[in-house]
């Protein structure tokens, strides 16, 4: 069985009529930019556990569960467009990393969001 090296913490943020679940690893503060990990379609933030453990850095890392995935609530109608993901990301960063430089990494759909955001 896999032994987690860096346990995560969870928080929930009311955002655009949804309850967003965000997973956190590492210290609350770091001299390094916050690393923001964006998961792909049909995935969840917890899938980054292996990546976080492999990094072995004392760095603040956050990863949201996108709307309708993991522990984040979904919309009443299955309506998912990139404009919503970009707006959600903008507000998430305003809350968790206001005015900070960040390193933004995405996989699959999360990579598309990261590229469009940058």
Region spans (language model):
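Alpha/beta-hydrolase fold catalytic core
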Residues: 1-36, 56-59, 94-100
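Active-site signature of alpha/beta-hydrolase-fold catalytic machinery across serine-
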Residues: 50, 116-117
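Active-site loop/oxyanion-hole signature of alpha/beta-hydrolase fold enzymes
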Residues: 18, 66-105
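Aromatic pocket-lining residues of Rossmann-like dinucleotide-binding sites
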Residues: 55, 117-118
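Gly/Ala-rich beta-loop-alpha elbow adjacent to hydrolase catalytic centers
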Residues: 106, 110, 114
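Conserved HGGG/HGGXW glycine-rich cap/lid loop of the alpha/beta-hydrolase fold
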Residues: 21, 25-74
